[in-house]
Amino acid sequence: MNGDDLARELRDDHETEFSRLGSSKAMYALTGGDMDGDSVRAAAATDALAFAEVLEGWSGTDTTAALHSDLAAAARDYATAVDDDPSLDEEPLLYDELAGFDTAPARLGGLLGRYLVVSEYASQMVGFFVGDADPTAAADFRELRSELDAEHDRVVDTLDSACATANEWAAARDAAETVIDAAYDDYVGT
C-alpha cells in the first residue's frame, strides 16, 4: 500500500459520494442556498479557516508537526485570498471529525480525505465563476485549486513515510473514510 493507492481506492470506493460532493447541489449546500460570488468566496474561506484551526489545534509532538504548520499557514492565506474579510461562522462537520484524530496515520488519512473532498468543492467553485462570467475569480480559484493539489501530493508523500504497517494504513484509511462520510452527511443534511 502507498498513499497514491489509498487515494485511488478511496475515490473508487466512494464514487457516489464524490460525484455528489462535486455537483452544483453541493455548492448550493455549501453556500446555504446563496448562489452568488460573495457567498461562494465566504464558503471557501470558512472551509479554509476551519481547516487551519484543526491543524493549529494538533499538538506539535508528532513527526508531522511541520506539515500541519505549513498547511495551516497556507489555509489562512487561502482564506484571505478568496474573501476580503474571512470569518468562521459555522464549521463544516468534517472538521469536527478531523480534529478528533490523535495519531499520525489517522491524522494523515483524515487530511487525505479532506483534500479529496475539497478538490471536488474547488472544481465546482471554478465552474461557478466560469458560469458567472467572472474570469478573474475563475483564474484565482484555478490557481488555488493547483495549490490544493500540491498540498494533497505532500500529504500523500508524508503518508508513505509515516505508515509502515498494515495497521497504520488501516488507521489512515478509516480516518479518510470518516472525513469523507462526514462531508457527505453534511451535504445530505443541508
Q: Would you name each region that the model predicts?
A:
Residues N2-T190:
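Non-heme di-metal
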